[in-house]
Amino acid sequence: VEDKHLGGICLNWGCIPTKAMLRSAEVFLLMKRAGEFGLTAEKINYDLSSVISRSRKVAKQLSQGVDYLMKKNKVRTFMGEAVLTAPDIVEVRTARDKELIKARNIILATGARARELPGLEADGDLVWTYRHALQPKRMPKKLLVIGSGAIGIEFASFYNTLGAETTVVEVVSRILPLEDAEVSDFARKQFVKQGMDILEKALVEKLDRKKGLVTAHIKQNG
């Protein structure tokens, strides 16, 4: 049972589309370094809408691939919502009707959504969630990324490479805190070398929004 797109968050709104965006940024960076490879390239630029369109296309193709595999392996698929009405009964609600399914084993794979942080609520214009960052209407001149987990760092790298003045704020003592310390240290050095600002042991306390701009109040320890 799936309410939107087969493949869930990772395939449609997470690691797959971000990797497609990062690939575009990587090629853009390589083109800017063409001279290092004995090549000549002039007026190198990017079209943000085309970059995003490619990313969404990649996600869509893979989602359709999952749909194909479901049909090939004769897995019955419902596009709708599921509600547990008993320990062994699921009520499936689709656009057309409702159906009860009884099963001994039920797997809850609910996916994820962006958590609303008090005082930092997203509006899709000045303050984004990951979904807004995957479908930007314009390229920001400055970008503050709160959190340096995998997806936060991916967005920071993408927008920094394409020219946004990017700052990353991480509440603990190092970026990519779930990775090995050596990996975090190496990544930090590379990102700083690329012009990214990184604030560790830092907390965004509140945002002031006025006249199309956001001012972040950041408290940093150490």
Q: What residue ranges belong to the model's regions?
A:
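Gly/Ala-rich phosphate-binding loop of Rossmann-like dinucleotide-binding domains
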Residues: 156, 160-161
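N-terminal Rossmann-fold NAD(P) dinucleotide-binding loop
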Residues: 152-153
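Rossmann-fold dehydrogenase core element
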Residues: 165, 191, 198-200
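Phosphate/pyrophosphate-binding betaalpha-module
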Residues: 203
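Glycine-rich flavin
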Residues: 2-139, 167, 172-176, 180-183, ...
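Short loop/turn elements that form and flank the Walker-type P-loop nucleotide-binding site
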Residues: 139-140, 162
